[in-house]
């Protein structure tokens, strides 16, 4: 199987935490991170998105190329610059962000920019919610997912909510639920599950929102909770997997490493959506996939940066 990740690629300027403070440039952006994570673990992977025709956009493309990610679906524009994120870390490695977006190049990818061969050539399509923040890129994302679904692809969605990237939260829920209705795999943090539950179902138990996600057609829902157990939900069963203990220095790409690990493992075991659904009928298959993904996430948080912190298959084999 092969994977295409659609959405934003940006520059993370990571603080050194010293005084006077300085920042180091890293290629990043959640979908781009997932593409690199999966490629480093051996999956045939592409990135699809709009980059600024500037020094940062070309730096990102070069970084993707160097990590064996196919960039033939990338486009460049001079109508906006590549997005920037300044990232500060606290003592536990947790992040705080200051974004220079919008305007940004990634928001300008349109339906006409898609190479439709992409939908026929990739068995998994992955997106995040940062490509839902404005109307045009939301419409493009929905179009891409719809075309992928028509082609029989597995659709993966990581909510990865960044409220400060939304001009208004007025449309957030409707857009999230629209993507969930197209997804086969959904990954949320516990805080994101609480957000969905509070905004959608108010005082109802969290299980109400979990049931709604599964009834929307999602095959596998994953809920992470920092270093706590990872919960998974299927229409017929649920379970938990404990992640490995690790020293956290930077959580920048933790969730993306997790998703990349999960999708790479699915790509190894499944040939198409039908075999994916059959694979997910066995709890042990999901548990083993999550355990592998959790190892990838644990590796990433023990190192700085995004692409640079993502493990190879050999790295994870050494961790065993």
Regions inferred by a protein language model and the residue ranges of each:
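Short beta-strand scaffold segments in enzyme catalytic cores
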Residues: 36, 84-88, 229-233
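Glycine-rich phosphate/adenosyl-contacting loop at the front of the ribokinase-like
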Residues: 1-70
């Amino acid at each position: 199987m092969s994977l295409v990740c659609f959405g934003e690629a940006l520059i993370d300027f990571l603080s050194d935490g010293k005084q006077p403070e300085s920042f180091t440039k890293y290629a990043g952006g959640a979908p781009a991170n997932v593409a690199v994570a999966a490629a480093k673990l051996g999956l045939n992977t592409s990135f699809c998105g709009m980059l600024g025709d500037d020094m940062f956009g070309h730096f990102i493309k070069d970084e993707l190329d160097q990590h064996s990610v196919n960039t033939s679906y990338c486009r460049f524009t001079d109508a906006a610059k590549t997005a920037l994120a300044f990232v500060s870390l606290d003592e536990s490695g947790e992040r705080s962000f200051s974004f220079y977006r919008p305007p940004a190049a990634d928001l300008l990818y349109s339906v006409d920019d898609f190479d439709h061969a992409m939908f026929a050539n990739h068995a998994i399509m992955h997106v995040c919610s940062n490509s839902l923040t404005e109307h045009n890129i939301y419409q493009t994302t929905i179009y891409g997912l719809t075309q992928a679904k028509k082609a029989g692809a597995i659709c993966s969605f990581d909510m990865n909510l960044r409220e400060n990237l939304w001009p208004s939260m007025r449309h957030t829920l409707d857009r999230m639920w629209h993507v969930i209705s197209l997804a086969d795999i959904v990954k949320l943090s516990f805080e994101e599950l609480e957000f969905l539950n509070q905004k959608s179902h108010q005082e109802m138990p969290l299980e109400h929102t979990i049931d709604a996600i599964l009834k929307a057609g999602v095959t596998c829902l994953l809920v992470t909770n920092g270093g706590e157990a990872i919960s998974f939900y299927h229409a017929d069963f649920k379970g938990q997997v404990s992640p490995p203990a690790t020293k956290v220095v930077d959580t920048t790409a933790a969730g993306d490493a997790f998703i990349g690990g999960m999708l790479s493992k699915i790509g190894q075991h499944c040939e198409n959506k039908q075999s994916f659904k059959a694979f997910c009928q066995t709890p042990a298959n999901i548990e083993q996939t999550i355990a592998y993904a959790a190892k990838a996430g644990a590796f990433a948080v023990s190192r700085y940066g995004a692409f640079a912190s993502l493990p190879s298959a050999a790295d994870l084999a050494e961790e065993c």
